[in-house]
């Protein structure tokens, strides 16, 4: 009788362990199926149309930023305006990761062209990002290199890059898309001198003010990311006029591409 009881207890324990294992696997599957995409823009023009398209929208205000959760064309997303600059972008990215548990991040918005072949209205999809204003060269570091980290560039996720290029072709077929380095810094580039300095020091296809900070935080947290930027100006002496004239149209184009990308994950 004792042997039968022991055998029964053993069977029960094995069944419970199998159920626990099955539940864990199912939970993992659910997490993957309901995974969220964080979408960050610095300005209203870059995120407003995405926010307006959200279904089942829920808004949380954290650190002065409005995080809008919801469904975007069937995908779970969190859309947020981080504000201008690298500090805002970095703080926003960490909140998306910690509070909203996003599994990937898209940075959408506008940028200035650093390449003569890239014109206003074109799209740049990041292969990597660098901070052009990180300058500790006086201590022997390369321009853009972050001291004690050994890092200066942060590679974008290859699968996300591929989907971004596909999204450009589908959502904006008349737009030219380029893949390459995005250079970020807390400067609004509006002169040939500034532009030439960036090109000669760290290079890049375009310049803006948030992408590399988002990339660095994503790298620290092992979260895949991609930066998608529509060109609104040439980052030179014609900056002010072209930026004001084209920023809204460029941002809307980029938002449409981002929307297509999350809907076809």
Give the residues covered by each predicted segment.
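Nucleotide and nucleotide-moiety/phosphate-recognizing core
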Residues: 57
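Glycine-rich phosphate- or other oxyanion-binding loops that anchor nucleotides, phosphorylated ligands
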Residues: 28, 32-37, 60-265
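Bacterial N-terminal signal peptides that target proteins for export
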Residues: 2-12
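General helical secondary-structure elements
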Residues: 1-2, 225
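Bacterial N-terminal signal peptides
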Residues: 11-22
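Sec/Tat signal peptide C-region and signal peptidase I cleavage site
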Residues: 24-26
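Intrinsically disordered, low-complexity Ser/Thr- and Pro-rich stretches
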Residues: 5-7, 17-18, 29
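Short, conserved "active-site rim" segments that organize catalytic pockets and cofactor/ligand binding
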Residues: 34-54, 76
């Amino acid at each position: 009788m004792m042997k039968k009881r022991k055998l029964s207890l053993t069977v029960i324990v094995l069944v419970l362990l199998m159920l626990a294992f099955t539940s864990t696997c199912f939970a993992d599957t659910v997490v993957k199926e309901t995974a969220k995409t964080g979408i960050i823009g610095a300005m209203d023009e870059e995120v407003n149309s995405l926010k307006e398209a959200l279904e089942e929208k829920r808004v949380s205000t954290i650190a002065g930023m409005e995080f809008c959760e919801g469904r975007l064309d069937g995908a779970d997303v969190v859309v947020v305006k981080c504000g201008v600059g690298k500090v805002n972008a970095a703080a926003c990215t960490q909140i998306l990761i910690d509070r909203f548990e996003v599994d990937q991040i898209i940075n959408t918005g506008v940028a200035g062209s650093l390449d003569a072949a890239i014109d206003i209205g074109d799209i740049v999809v990041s292969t990597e990002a660098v901070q052009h204003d990180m300058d500790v060269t006086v201590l022997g570091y390369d321009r853009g290199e972050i001291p004690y980290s050994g890092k200066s560039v942060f590679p974008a996720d290859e699968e996300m890059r591929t989907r971004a290029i596909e999204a450009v072709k589908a959502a904006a077929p008349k737009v030219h898309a380029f893949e390459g380095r995005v250079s970020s810094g807390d400067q609004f580039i509006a002169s040939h001198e500034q532009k030439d300095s960036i090109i000669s020091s760290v290079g890049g296809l375009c310049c803006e003010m948030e992408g590399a900070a988002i990339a660095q935080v994503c790298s620290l947290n092992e979260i895949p990311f991609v930066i998608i930027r529509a060109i609104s100006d040439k980052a030179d002496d014609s900056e002010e006029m072209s930026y004001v004239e084209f920023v809204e149209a460029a941002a809307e184009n980029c938002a449409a591409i981002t929307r297509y990308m999350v809907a076809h994950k």
